[in-house]
Amino acid sequence: GMYFRKRAQEIVDLTDKMLVDLEVQDYDLKGDIHIGCGETTGMKELIATMKKVHDEYPDIHFHIHSGNGLDIRESVEKGLYDFGLFVGKLDFSKMETYPLRYKNIWGLICRKDDPLASLPYITKEQVCELPLITSRQGMREQILHDWLGKEKKDLNIVATYNLFYNAGFMVEQKLGYALSIDGLQQSHEDLVFIPFEPKLEAPLFLVWKKYQAFSKAAQKFLEAFKAGEAGEEGQ
């Protein structure tokens, strides 16, 4: 019953979105753009484009849906979101991708009063000795396993998370140390980020469904985003 209810709601959401897109197709540039986003400071790159587009076309409105990579990918594939902003590499075989120049880096998040907090960086040998709170997506993609040189069963993983905000409370309460990308600790004033050494980058991608029939508003956003990224590259 819950499965069919979820699928029915997805059909209703997609139908509503299509009706809005069709309504604005032949009029002045306006409409709604839905973007699914993982947690990343790279979101600032998208916001810069959103502001530029909205300043020029004030009847274009944006709707941001936060979530983990797998949930966002599913919604993009089903056409519920126009775009998705991803941290790291998933299976994008059903989608078009555009890599951002901006990259996050992986590291360890701990309390400011922890003895490790003053370190300029942290090595895999040090990390492997700690009780860890890990990103489920990061572990699933194998990138953390590869960097650490160990499998999940060989690590002391006390908890996992899909979005960092609640993981930050676990770190504050001394449950363990979080493996995360940079910037997310800013939501918790008592936490600090220590980068991995050697550095481990997390690439960012803007993605959309293959053969997507964009609304005029979504097409304008994509063109503006690509132009902004190309402009940065030329600077």
Regions found by a protein language model. Give the residues of each.
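Flexible hinge/capping segments at coil-to-helix
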Residues: 26, 95-132, 216
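A late-sequence structural motif
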Residues: 45, 194-235
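Hydrophobic residues within well-ordered alpha-helices
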Residues: 1, 35, 76-77, 127, ...
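Central regulatory/effector-binding core of bacterial HTH transcription factors
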Residues: 30-92, 160-161
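Alpha-helical "hinge/linker" immediately C-terminal to small N-terminal DNA-binding modules
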Residues: 1-30
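Hydrophobic hinge/microswitch elements
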Residues: 68-81, 87, 139-192
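Beta-alpha-beta core module
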Residues: 93-99, 103-105, 165-211
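Secondary-structure junction motif
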Residues: 116-117, 130-151, 214-222
